[in-house]
């Protein structure tokens, strides 16, 4: 099994194969990807769709000297397997294992780290210009999906690249008619019209004939090809940017891919190759439902993904989706917005029930935020469902277009804190710090499912921009209450009180997901625990009261410490006369790698044992055991 694949330890081995061996290799590679992902979980559909393209690129180009930048990067498993990491696939996305995305520190073939979309053309152009300035003669290649082409950054890069006539730059549009959710917007309709038109179908066949018979392209041949293409193919959007447009060609046909890429190698200036692929190619279940098989957990390939037979705790994403539908039922002004994450953000049901109030704006976070601001000026109640890591991409819009004008936009921030297998690129580590410094913002962090629901309701009642952050995955098991209750603005609550005497009294000020482990730590230490709920406005009265009645304060958050929620507590404490020693716990000042979420929290010292250990080391190393029966406040 995998007889050919076992002989490939790097692309040099691949380039020694006879062309006739490449399709059998592709079949083995596709089977290996399916087998590997079924055992570890990970991105599947996108990787099954890039097998032949990956083989062709490494076969034709002299990687790693020629640079390949994979946009988003979740389609790079075939690339990793062909570049010396075949055996590492058994550790994919696991702690101390290989990443699910390209990483420069992992391999010289990973020329640029990616995970967020639409960055590849900018990076590849920088490489192409840098190589030219250094006197190096190499190609720089950006592989970008049709979904990622909805982002403005891709067009900013193309606008710049189009005037770089002597850059050896190739942009490959991997057109699979999918991003994660189906792509949306005028650009995708434009591509669909071009590809489905009768005139274009005939033109495409003519261009493919030209490409298939062309010898290595000399300048004259290139001019003849462009002249012939100009006679039969309508001018495209990409040619208007200054690119030489080639395609579309079948991205699963090595006999089309390889000669075309070999011809492109002889050209200078920005080239644009349009390849058509199918997500899930070669695995019928993934072909039929590429969204379901986009990022599955472990499963049996022979049976496919089966519904869980054990009742699962409700996820925070589900809590949000249910709340949004309930809120829209009660108020016709509620509008839902997602930047191309319908399924991931829990908006499938909302789209079905309220299609006229559902807006998927594509991978366009900047536009999503300002679009929401515009809706708010007309008296609507926009809710932007967005991952914490992607909100970073719209920071100027958040400040300039929403907060500065004090517009009532609700930000439902999913994937706050660590996200497990997706690693540092997707961690929501910074939102508390970058949100709390913005004037007019209200910021809440949910500690359980029902609190999340009520916080979202509270956010919708505010006359200013308001954010509610919540984590990935299942909640704590707390049932949600159908009736809505508005949470008092800027007020936390004490969940447990210490019985320790003066000199040993510890108060833990916990935010969001850190309330539960803080209660566990408090049981071991007999400490007070406050569920702070609001990061902004911080409950200054509660902070100051705890400072007056306790000897030590501890702040705990699943976010960066510098500038985060703990800093807000320190600032509030310093305004009072009662200044106490403070221990601020949170994510470390480094990027946290991928792995099991519980293990990562433990390594960061943010589980119950870790919190208790840090408190003992800082404040109690000189004291006797202070544990006593717990006294929690209902």
UniProtKB/Swiss-Prot annotation:
Which Pfam families does this entry report, sorted A to Z?
DXP_synthase_N, Transket_pyr, Transketolase_C
Report the pathway entry. Metabolic intermediate biosynthesis; 1-deoxy-D-xylulose 5-phosphate biosynthesis; 1-deoxy-D-xylulose 5-phosphate from D-glyceraldehyde 3-phosphate and pyruvate: step 1/1
User: Keywords in UniProt for this one?
Assistant: Isoprene biosynthesis, Magnesium, Metal-binding, Thiamine biosynthesis, Thiamine pyrophosphate, Transferase
Per the UniProt entry, the Enzyme Commission number(s) are 2.2.1.7
Cofactor(s), by name: Mg(2+); thiamine diphosphate
Which cysteine pairs make disulfide bonds? none
Where do the annotations place thiamine diphosphate binding?
Answer: 74, 115-117, 147-148, 176, 283, 365
HAMAP family, alphabetized: DXP_synth
Please give the subunit comment from the record: Homodimer.
Q: Which family does it belong to?
A: Belongs to the transketolase family. DXPS subfamily.
Q: What is this protein called?
A: 1-deoxy-D-xylulose-5-phosphate synthase
